[in-house]
Amino acid sequence: MERIVLFLAIVSLVKSDQICIGYHANNSTEQVDTIMEKNVTVTHAQDILEKTHNGKLCSLNGVKPLILRDCSVAGWLLGNPMCDEFLNVPEWSYIVEKDNPINSLCYPGDFNDYEELKHLLSSTNHFEKIQIIPRSSWSNHDASSGVSSACPYNGRSSFFRNVVWLIEKNNAYPTIKRSYNNTNQEDLLILWGIHHPNDAAEQTKLYQNPTTYVSVGTSTLNQRSIPEIATRPKVNGQSGRVEFFWTILKPNDAINFESNGNFIAPEYAYKIVKKGDSAIMKSDLEYGNCNAKCQTPVGAINSSMPFHNIHPLTIGECPKYVKSDRLVLATGLRNVPQRETRRQKRGLFGAIAGFIEGGWQGMVDGWYGYHHSNEQGSGYAADKESTQKAIDGITNKVNSIIDKMNTQFETVGKEFNNLERRIENLNKKMEDGFLDVWTYNAELLVLMENERTLDFHDSNVKNLYDKVRLQLKDNAKELGNGCFEFYHKCDNECMESVRNGTYDYPQYSEEARLNREEISGVKLELMGVYQILSIYSTVASSLALAIMIAGLSFWMCSNGSLQCRICI
């Protein structure tokens, strides 16, 4: 009995000095997905998917957009009378055009290679309008009567501001031969047109000559157009049509015009004074007096995140568009407060801290650390070195992911004419395919990195555990839950030496050996006592059973229930 009491006293004494290795926990409810699991609660996480915008059109890097309101690009460049506010425009960061602007080609017709012209604008930030052929220089032709009720201004007939519709003068239309030399250092955008009358009577009334042409030539262009006279349905009250053309005139090049009728001559041209990243965006939004780095048709984005799911079309320094609803990177640990007392699952990359059944909410100044208890008390202490290394590693990884993904990335709608619908459909399918690939890559990246991060934390906890185990050796007992029981007294100074890696094993080894042997001896003696008691119990119970059987047999024989015969 004295041995048992001594054993219990020793066990009680040793249990009072313990050190445990554990990790931080908090009240976070943030969840992430990994390759192996979904909705894993973690202590810290970082969202890398931007989902919000401001619903406005903003300046990009301080430069306002050119918002054409009810005008189209064609209406702006040709000078539709209803677009006079855009006759001279400052530098723009991008151009905004509505889906179906009402002020486009007021006189019905067509704009040749219109989609290519819009593509040109995607690399232009500023035009300077200059006069190349003054209206007053057409002394042999009528340069003021070429107007139409289809292009009204202040209740009167008018025409496009930047071109001149030349008609006969004094019943004559002399052949035009006019040249312009580009002496500027910049490229010039030049526009002109040809008129297609409704019938022969209109042809001779306007131009006198029944058979006419318009010829244009530069060092790279050789074009000859002939009017097509035909009866057509009226559009905007007009049966005639106009067809507009454009070209880029390089510095030191010349453009030559020759025509004997139906010529719509250029008065102004556009000097391309600044090239850069621009685009034409389809949107009905108004300017919001704001500044941003990234613009979408539904609003501006101000974000450093690498991905967004707001709109596939963007302009500026934008995150990459993905179709995902959620992309969250784990930056902290699995959040398993100790009260839950459930074992952690092991991950794909070898999560190895599953022997610890919960985190500590009491440890707030680090991710990994210690809890000790001895005669002087108990407390938590973070291992700041391993915590800082982990923070630096994860921060660098997150920043690396963001830097690699968050490059200047923009995608704008491409323009196709009616003859290119199959190309447009193919282009849309290809873009959808690219978006699917981007989305898959982004989601897989997040799942893989989250798995690695959580396993990285588990590995750090295990490394801390091994650091303590290798120091203590047989001076302490592993309890299997991340804790060690000392076989010797370990005061606060001793605990600190374990934590900082300076534990003096020889100093405590003799005390630990004696306590360990004492506990082992008590265990052996108790085991011998238990064996004697078990033998005695077996013999006694067998003897009692034999006596009971003999008594029962005697009783049954005496009352005749059992016949007993003894044969010799």
UniProtKB/Swiss-Prot annotation:
<dbReference type="InterPro" id="IPR013828">
    <property type="entry name" value="Hemagglutn_HA1_a/b_dom_sf"/>
</dbReference>
<feature type="disulfide bond">
    <location>
        <begin position="106"/>
        <end position="151"/>
    </location>
</feature>
<feature type="disulfide bond" description="Interchain (between HA1 and HA2 chains)">
    <location>
        <begin position="20"/>
        <end position="483"/>
    </location>
</feature>
<feature type="glycosylation site" description="N-linked (GlcNAc...) asparagine; by host">
    <location>
        <position position="27"/>
    </location>
</feature>
<keyword id="KW-1164">Virus endocytosis by host</keyword>
<feature type="topological domain" description="Extracellular">
    <location>
        <begin position="17"/>
        <end position="531"/>
    </location>
</feature>
<keyword id="KW-0564">Palmitate</keyword>
<dbReference type="GO" id="GO:0020002">
    <property type="term" value="C:host cell plasma membrane"/>
</dbReference>
<dbReference type="GO" id="GO:0046761">
    <property type="term" value="P:viral budding from plasma membrane"/>
</dbReference>
<keyword id="KW-1043">Host membrane</keyword>
<feature type="glycosylation site" description="N-linked (GlcNAc...) asparagine; by host">
    <location>
        <position position="302"/>
    </location>
</feature>
<dbReference type="GO" id="GO:0055036">
    <property type="term" value="C:virion membrane"/>
</dbReference>
<keyword id="KW-1162">Viral penetration into host cytoplasm</keyword>
<keyword id="KW-1161">Viral attachment to host cell</keyword>
<dbReference type="GO" id="GO:0019064">
    <property type="term" value="P:fusion of virus membrane with host plasma membrane"/>
</dbReference>
<feature type="glycosylation site" description="N-linked (GlcNAc...) asparagine; by host">
    <location>
        <position position="500"/>
    </location>
</feature>
<keyword id="KW-0325">Glycoprotein</keyword>
<feature type="disulfide bond">
    <location>
        <begin position="490"/>
        <end position="494"/>
    </location>
</feature>
<dbReference type="GO" id="GO:0075512">
    <property type="term" value="P:clathrin-dependent endocytosis of virus by host cell"/>
</dbReference>
<feature type="transmembrane region" description="Helical">
    <location>
        <begin position="532"/>
        <end position="552"/>
    </location>
</feature>
<dbReference type="GO" id="GO:0046789">
    <property type="term" value="F:host cell surface receptor binding"/>
</dbReference>
<comment type="similarity">
    <text>Belongs to the influenza viruses hemagglutinin family.</text>
</comment>
<comment type="subunit">
    <text>Homotrimer of disulfide-linked HA1-HA2.</text>
</comment>
<feature type="signal peptide">
    <location>
        <begin position="1"/>
        <end position="16"/>
    </location>
</feature>
<feature type="glycosylation site" description="N-linked (GlcNAc...) asparagine; by host">
    <location>
        <position position="181"/>
    </location>
</feature>
<feature type="disulfide bond">
    <location>
        <begin position="71"/>
        <end position="83"/>
    </location>
</feature>
<keyword id="KW-1165">Clathrin-mediated endocytosis of virus by host</keyword>
<dbReference type="Pfam" id="PF00509">
    <property type="entry name" value="Hemagglutinin"/>
</dbReference>
<keyword id="KW-1168">Fusion of virus membrane with host membrane</keyword>
<feature type="glycosylation site" description="N-linked (GlcNAc...) asparagine; by host">
    <location>
        <position position="26"/>
    </location>
</feature>
<keyword id="KW-1160">Virus entry into host cell</keyword>
<feature type="topological domain" description="Cytoplasmic">
    <location>
        <begin position="553"/>
        <end position="568"/>
    </location>
</feature>
<keyword id="KW-0472">Membrane</keyword>
<keyword id="KW-0946">Virion</keyword>
<comment type="function">
    <text>Binds to sialic acid-containing receptors on the cell surface, bringing about the attachment of the virus particle to the cell. This attachment induces virion internalization either through clathrin-dependent endocytosis or through clathrin- and caveolin-independent pathway. Plays a major role in the determination of host range restriction and virulence. Class I viral fusion protein. Responsible for penetration of the virus into the cell cytoplasm by mediating the fusion of the membrane of the endocytosed virus particle with the endosomal membrane.</text>
</comment>
<feature type="lipid moiety-binding region" description="S-palmitoyl cysteine; by host">
    <location>
        <position position="564"/>
    </location>
</feature>
<feature type="lipid moiety-binding region" description="S-palmitoyl cysteine; by host">
    <location>
        <position position="557"/>
    </location>
</feature>
<dbReference type="InterPro" id="IPR000149">
    <property type="entry name" value="Hemagglutn_influenz_A"/>
</dbReference>
<protein>
    <recommendedName>
        <fullName>Hemagglutinin</fullName>
    </recommendedName>
</protein>
<dbReference type="GO" id="GO:0019031">
    <property type="term" value="C:viral envelope"/>
</dbReference>
<feature type="glycosylation site" description="N-linked (GlcNAc...) asparagine; by host">
    <location>
        <position position="39"/>
    </location>
</feature>
<dbReference type="GO" id="GO:0039654">
    <property type="term" value="P:fusion of virus membrane with host endosome membrane"/>
</dbReference>
